[in-house]
C-alpha cells in the first residue's frame, strides 16, 4: 500500500514538474475556450499597398499575408472562428468588377472567414449591383462566408409594395442564404453570430433602397429568439455600427449596454483601431482598423456562470515582415488582370501606368481626421477637378469658381516615388455613376455666395463632430477661429483665381461649383448635423433647385467624367522637370497656400466681433433661458414666502 502511494506521489510530482517546465496551460475540466480572428472595413484591399503610417512610408495589408496569419492560427487551433464586420468592398480597383466577379466575397471565403455582414459601401453599386454581386458569388461555386444581418425591415417594405430594387435584393438574399443570425459549431462550442446594420451606416448609404429596423431593438429580438430556439454557448455580433469618442452616441457601445446577452461585438464602420477591448457589463467590443492593416486576434474562456472572459487580445500588424501565401497571391493577381481588360482599357490606362513622379510628402489619410486645417492632399485633388473640367475637349467655357473635396471621399494618400493609375484610383475609389460604370462622376452645381460662406462654416463648425465633412477647396479661401461661437467661427471668406487675386464674394450671385456625386448626395447628412440651420441647395445655372444630382454629371460624349480620372489627368499634365519623359509633381504642393487658415486668437474682441445671425440667435436663446430661470427662481421665492407666512 505504501509502495503504491509512493509511486503515485512520484508520478504526480513528475506531472507537475512537466507542466511547469513545458508551460502547458491548465484549465478547469470542461472549460470551453474560443479563439477568434477578425477584420472589418477591408474595402477591397485584397493586395498589399504602400501608404504613410506614423509619418513613415510602409507596405501594409494584403489578403495573401492575412491568409498566412489565419493558417498559422488554425495550426494551433483548427476551430478558430473568423469574422468580418462589413464594408468588405469599395476601395481599390478590384471593386470595378464587384458585380461581375464578387472578388471580395470570394476571397473572404478562400481565406476561411465564417461570417460577415453588410456595410454601407456594399450598397454603392445600387440594388442591382449588390444583387448581381451575390449571384456572382453563388455562381462561382466557391466557398463563401455566411452573411448575417437582422434588421432589414422586409415587413415595412412589403406593406408598401416592394420596388424593383428591393425585389432584386430580396431574391439575391434568399438565393445566397442571408440570415438574421447563423449558428456555428467550433469544437465543443456552439456560437450564434448576429449581424446588424447601424444607423450612421444607413446615413452614409445614399443609394440604399432598403428600410431598416432600429439596430438595438432588432438585435434584442434576435438574441431573444436565439436563446429560445438555439442551445448556444456564446452570442457574437458582427456590427456595422461603429464606436465614437462620445459614448452616448457610440452605436456599438449603446448596443452592448442595451443587449447585455451579447458576449462579443466585432465593430465595423467607424474604422476604429482599439488596442484594448471596450467592455460594458459582460460584453466585449473590438475593432482593428481599416484596409486589412491589422488582423484582430482574441481568445475567450467560459466562466462558471456561462458568460465569457477575454483572456487575450491583440492587433497583429499585417506588415511586409509576413510572408504572403503564394496561392492566395496568385488568385489576387488573376482577379486584378481582369481589371485592366474589363475596366481601365475603356479609359486608356493600365493599372501600373506611371502618371507622375513624386518627391512631395503628402499628408496621411489619418491626418485628414485629426488635423482641421489646409492639407496638401486635399489641395491637389480639388485643383485636379478644376483642371479636368476646364481642359476637357467638351468644356463649355464656363469657368469653375470653386471645387470641393470632402475628407470622407478620400481613401488614401500618395507616397513618394512613382504615382500609378492604381494609386490614383485607390485614393478616390468610391461608388458608381448613373451610367453603371465604377467611380463617382464629377457634377456641376451652382451655389449663391451666401451658401459658399455657409459651406466654409460647415467645415469650421460641423466637421469636428463629423470629420468626413472637412472640406478642401480650390478657389475658396477662408479663415476660422475654433474658439468662437459655433456656427460663427468663420471670420474671413473669399474667392481666389489662379494668380492668387482675392475676389470678394457677393451673397446673391450664383457661383459655379464642381464636386463629386457622393458629396452632393451626402449634403443632407451634413445639414442634419447643424439641425437644419446650415442649408445648402444645389442649383442649375439658372438658379433652379436641382431635383436629381445624377443628371448634373459632367459628360464627355455620353461618358461621365469620373473623379478619379480627373485626378489622373491632372497628374499626367504636370511638367516633366527632370527630362525622363514622366511628369513630376510640382513643388507647389510641398507647402500650403492659405486656403484654410486657423486663427487661434483668444482675444475677447476677436471672439465676439462681427456676429452673424446664428450667433445672435444662440445669444438670444441663451438670454431667453436665463430670463426663464430667473422668473422661476423669483416665483419659487414668492411661493416659499407665502408658505412661511401661512405657517406663522
Q: How should these model regions be labeled?
A:
Residues 7, 99, 432-433:
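Hydrophobic alpha-helical segments with strong N-terminal bias
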Residues 30-38, 44-69, 75, 110, ...:
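Catalytic centers of hydrolytic enzymes
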Residues 1-3:
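N-terminal secretory signal peptides that target proteins for export/translocation
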Residues 6-25, 626-632:
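Sec-dependent N-terminal signal peptides of Gram-positive bacterial secreted proteins and lipoproteins
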